[in-house]
């Protein structure tokens, strides 16, 4: 029987932006990856394994799994070469993670081809979110946000940002608020330098009008055998630059009710979004995928941005979705956060469920705050 092995590589968006297979994450990103490497255990299939940094983390995964009645086991990097009949499920696929696994001794035939990795990179380009927007717009009468525009010339970007103060300028390969410029003052040298640098590296930029935000949420999917399966919903908060801040943890029904209370047509739009994901992504991609969406105020009317971005990978929203549905006691609601502490975490706080191990050298942790 094929053994499924999950792994956490949160730098995958940056690896896709870099291209090729030689991206090296900065030290802080490597540290975060090591400290939070157990996160996939919360959405991994029963009987699978999670790649962790060392023996101490493996013991934490095994003991936590046993305590909760899971059948998840940890595996350390030095054991990967022995996985002769395994399928790998990284946080996200790229040429970089493929090369890292091969370097650890994983047989190349167990991994996707280089052509498949290039296909993933092309699908991760933000212009496919424009295709999503058009697909949904053609199949609904609901009022939706303006469709983003892609430009390959700085003057066109500047003209757009000048006409639409507060717009968002986005690099084609980026995610979770990274590679995004909130253009409050587009006439500055800083704005010009950022845009021209991004155009040189990634050849185009996507421009979106700023919206009066009401609620950030996402639909979480799994793509398999050419079809997209809706796993659930996530509701989260983002900062001024659209970077993920925290997420609500609760049952699938509770999260649905939060969104539907502000946007009753959620029931009608969800099948259309699912169809769009199947049509645009699932034919050439297998794995997790999140569609970030936005409710916004337009002159007193609540409207929908149906595709702020598509994350072609697992997401923190997937973690909150699965934990809320399968881990928290019925009726319990919490808030998911990732915390950094330069001095570590010598004292575990009450009213927290820690989703990653706290060890003497831990500086990043993921937890659910209760109460």
Each predicted region: which residue ranges?
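C-terminal structural cap/anchor segments
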Residues: 285-345
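ATP-dependent carboxylate/phosphate-activation module, predominantly the ATP-grasp catalytic core
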Residues: 221-275, 311-337
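Peripheral (often C-terminal) accessory segments that flank ATP-dependent C-N-forming ligase machineries
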Residues: 328-371
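Conserved N-proximal alpha/beta basic substrate-recognition cap immediately N-terminal to
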Residues: 30-43, 51-159
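Phosphate-binding site of ATP-dependent enzymes
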Residues: 165, 188-244, 295-307
